Amino acid sequence: MLAQHLPVVVIGAGPVGLSAAVQLLDRGLDVLVLEAADDVGASQRDWGHVRLFSPWRYNVDKAAARHLEASGWVPPPPDDMPTGLELQQRYLLPLANLPLLSGRIRRNRRVTAITRVGVDKTRSAGRGDVPFLVRTHEEDILARAVIDASGTWWTPNPLGAAGISARGEAALAHRIHYGIPDVLGAHRERYAGKTTLVVGAGHSAANSLLPLVELASATPGTKVVWATRSADLTRVFGGGEADGLPARGRLGSALRELVDSGALQLVQHFRIDSLREVAGKLEVAGLRDGAPHVVRGVDAIIAATGQRPDLGMDRELRLGVDPALESVLALAPLIDPNVHSCGSVRPHGAVELAHPEPDFYIIGSKSYGRAPTFLLATGYEQARSVAAMIAGDREAALRVELDLPETGVCSSTRSAPAQDAGGGCCAPAKSACC
């Protein structure tokens, strides 16, 4: 069965998935975008109250912008920093509604498996000539190529220090928020007058801790406990006034001041093992500095512990995945968070993103696996390069067209006036993770 007349299937209608669709359409290829949620940009909507650290100029794909502007779209001020909701409503929704894309996006289509027609993972002969079969709950779709841009937002890391859920975590999931809740807005009542344990040592944790302390100053009985696996908080505190990104420096400095002032209780070097409910309160147990330790009297937990990729849908394909990071294999030495910040990751494209499975690519944050060093501008460059490679334009695929400022861009901070926005997701210098 010849596959060349079939569409390229893009999984995920977030910023990078829609960018890939535009790039493919610009090259004359048929495209079908499958989105598990009820609309595009569902992840951005979920953290809609959080303000990106990077300005609009680095959050809009250039190819997409050309089509939008041709339709009369007025771009937001390039140096303003959007919230997640603004990114969805002012960019992703207008993009998805363009005639170019509107009929090619299928919402509420969760992909459950990807394979080859009539061919399982073990068969090699003629494998690359057989179309892909992309299965959703509603239908099977045949494709000439598949781009997985489904992201990692919906698969957060658990609280357990060993990389698995802590004992009791699943049963108490209704007391845990994974990610960044809207503490001063939609989720205020959940935390007002309560004791909240925030787990994590990155900027997602900072973006929960700062509003929680603000809430505590206005609402009696509100208490904040911050638990970190590491004893070193340098990454989240940052460089202060010496930070190349001033707003990120302000965020870290504000958090450091809160810790120094005693406005929150800090539990460092704490490795969580179990959770249980006692008389309506949570007890969180584990090891602190190698000795048993229990945090008691907790009403709610915020798990700001990062994300990991869900590779379940891809398991019948021949993947090249790093055993530690679960990133695309060739990217691992480039993005290892033990070595690199976002800014030190060199530009890469279709060659690095290729798998042993021909014409299958993972792009966007999922391509980085568990590494927190992904930036949105890099995702757009990935999409451009992969689209060129699928279209047979290897020369264009090998070109580097990524343009970032000297100090880099980063995300994110909770919603605030744009000039006061700050945050970040990875350590030194130019960094971003949106």
Each model region followed by its residue ranges:
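Glycine-rich active-site loop/strand segments that organize a redox cofactor
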Residues: 37-91, 167, 179-185, 226-246, ...
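C-terminal, flexible cofactor-proximal segment of oxidoreductases
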Residues: 308, 314-315, 323-434
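N-terminal Rossmann-like FAD-binding beta1-loop-alpha1 element of flavoenzymes
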Residues: 6-33, 202-215
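Conserved Rossmann-like nucleotide-cofactor binding loop
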Residues: 16, 39, 153, 204, ...
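Residues at the starts of beta-strands that form the adenosine-phosphate
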Residues: 7, 30, 195, 220-223, ...
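Glycine-rich dinucleotide-binding loop and its adjacent helix/turn
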Residues: 150-218, 224, 325-334, 342-349
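Feature captures the FAD/FMN-dependent oxidoreductase FAD-binding
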Residues: 74-155, 273-284, 297-300
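A Rossmann-like FAD-binding core segment of flavoenzymes
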Residues: 113, 213-322, 388, 394-406
